[in-house]
UniProtKB/Swiss-Prot annotation:
It comes from Rattus norvegicus. Its main location: secreted. Can degrade fibronectin, gelatins of type I, III, IV, and V; weakly collagens III, IV, and V. Activates procollagenase. The lineage of its organism: Eukaryota, Metazoa, Chordata, Craniata, Vertebrata. This is Stromelysin-2. Zn(2+) 2 binds at residues 218, 222, 228. It catalyses: Similar to stromelysin 1, but action on collagen types III, IV and V is weak.
Length: 476
């Protein structure tokens, strides 16, 4: 249960660099565990020197206290025995930070009848036992909402359920036996809503091994839009624990209020009635083949094309031309929505992402430490408040920044703005009108995105060679 995925759980001696419990020394494995746990579930971004060498360990203490508070432990700020024991417990793989009973933005299914498919099976249990466990897990949520579920045997369902080991194609590899048991994604298109179970676990229907019904009930709560709860009585509490009454799970009031805030109560006399809070209108989800579609930013990332719009982005890969649709927060939780510009400086294997007067550096699915920074650190004058578009030209190792009717050129090698800039866009890119939304450099051409149109520009001939719809990259 993680939030680009949702996962079910889950050095040399460290002297004064890390808070210790009494005179106990933490061994390498304990420190590795603590570091990985805080990074994975509490968004801790360590600095090697600070983490292992500085005596001022307040950032570490705060993260330990944050973990202790969420999981209901005594807030000592130290790696005491109770804290280390909790870190060893199997749990959901979704991070605990966020403070939402539902996911940010409250994603939900826009219908009450939801399909699911069990794609493959664990060898630990008979197929019919797996079928029954999943059906009962969904029934837990069905009993307190208007939702109904139906299973299909082929094709794509709203919720695709599968068993896998290690790296399985979603940036959230499983870790073998223990700790992260499973993960699921919040509602949405593509792999959103799907639930993955670590097949390295020993799945069971009783107290031995890992109880599939209990884990599935938790994970499918994520598939319906619920986040983690810090209530130990809640089914959505992230740490796994077997209940002897597992055949008759009773949702906590926290669980009921969370799911009913998304879908309402079950329309029957025996349903638990909970007032449904008013919900602010959510931003519309962009439609890829909308003829009026425009993009906020466009870039490449390690050979893939990324097209950003509001809270979402499309991802088109070389091996799968059908674009995937994702929430920005699912890959980069700390990035804002409604981006202004993005470009890949692939000589540095990173993407710079801009919004307002700030920018972030991203490598893979990690936002780099030390960001955001102010755009003026790149050499812009104080009069520049935001960037409209940016693009990197690999052959020249130059980045072009477009602002209004002008553009700047940045030397990536020297990390300085080139002299003689800004210049008018129309002087050097004839046929391209000011106020560019996004720019992409690919196949020897510049592609300028302006509203719902894009212009293919040949830099050698200094002319526009084609005019296309912006979303033609999305097979529209």
């Amino acid at each position: 249960m993680e939030p680009l995925a949702i996962l079910v759980l889950l050095c040399f001696p460290i002297c004064s660099a890390y808070p210790l419990h009494g005179a106990v020394r933490q061994d390498h494995s304990t420190m590795d565990l603590a570091q990985q746990y805080l990074e994975k579930y509490y968004n801790f971004r360590k600095n090697e020197k600070q983490f292992f060498k500085r005596k001022d360990s307040s950032p570490v203490v705060k993260k330990i206290e944050e973990m202790q508070k969420f999981l209901g432990l005594e807030m000592t700020g130290k790696l005491d025995s109770n804290t280390v024991e909790m870190m060893h417990k199997p749990r959901c793989g979704v991070p605990d930070v966020g403070g939402f009973s539902t996911f940010p933005g409250s994603p939900k299914w826009r219908k009450n009848h939801i399909s699911y498919r069990i794609v493959n099976y664990t060898l630990d249990l008979p197929r019919e036992s797996v079928d029954s466990a999943i059906e009962r897990a969904l029934k837990v949520w069905e009993e307190v909402t208007p939702l109904t579920f139906s299973r299909i045997s082929e094709g794509e369902a709203d919720i695709m359920i599968s068993f896998a080991v290690g790296e399985h194609g979603d940036f959230y590899p499983f870790d073998g036996v223990g700790q992260s048991l499973a993960h699921a994604y919040p509602p949405g298109p593509g792999f959103y809503g799907d639930a993955h179970f670590d097949d390295d676990e020993k799945w069971s229907l009783g107290p031995s091994g890992t109880n599939l019904f209990l884990v599935a009930a938790h994970e499918l709560g994520h598939s319906l839009g619920l986040f983690h709860s810090n209530n130990k009585e809640s089914l959505m509490y992230p740490v796994y624990r077997f209940s002897t009454s597992q055949a008759n799970i009773r949702l906590s009031q926290d669980d009921i209020e969370g799911i009913q805030s998304l879908y309402g109560a079950r329309p029957s006399s025996d349903a638990t009635v909970v007032p449904v809070p008013s919900v602010s209108p959510k931003p519309e989800t962009p439609v890829k083949c909308d003829p009026a579609l425009s993009f906020d930013a466009v870039t490449m990332l390690r050979g893939e094309f990324l097209f950003f719009k509001d809270r979402h982005f499309w991802r088109r890969t070389q091996w799968n031309p059908e674009p995937e649709f994702h929430l920005i927060s699912a890959f980069w939780p700390s990035l804002p929505s409604g981006l202004d510009a993005a470009y890949e400086a692939n000589n540095k294997d990173r993407v710079l992402i801009f919004k307002g007067s700030q920018f972030w550096a991203v490598r893979g699915n990690e936002v780099q430490a030390g960001y955001p920074k102010r755009i003026h650190t790149l050499g812009f004058p104080p009069t520049v408040k935001k960037i409209d578009a940016a693009v990197f030209e690999k052959e020249k190792k130059k980045t072009y920044f477009f602002v209004g009717d002008k553009y700047w050129r940045f030397d990536e090698t020297r990390q300085l703005m080139d002299k003689g800039f800004p210049r008018l866009i129309t002087d050097d890119f004839p046929g391209i009108e000011p106020q560019v939304d996004a720019v992409l450099h690919a196949f020897g051409f510049f592609y300028f995105f302006c509203g719902s149109s894009q212009f293919e520009f040949d830099p050698n001939a200094r002319t526009v060679t084609h005019t296309l719809k912006s979303n033609s990259w999305l097979l529209c």
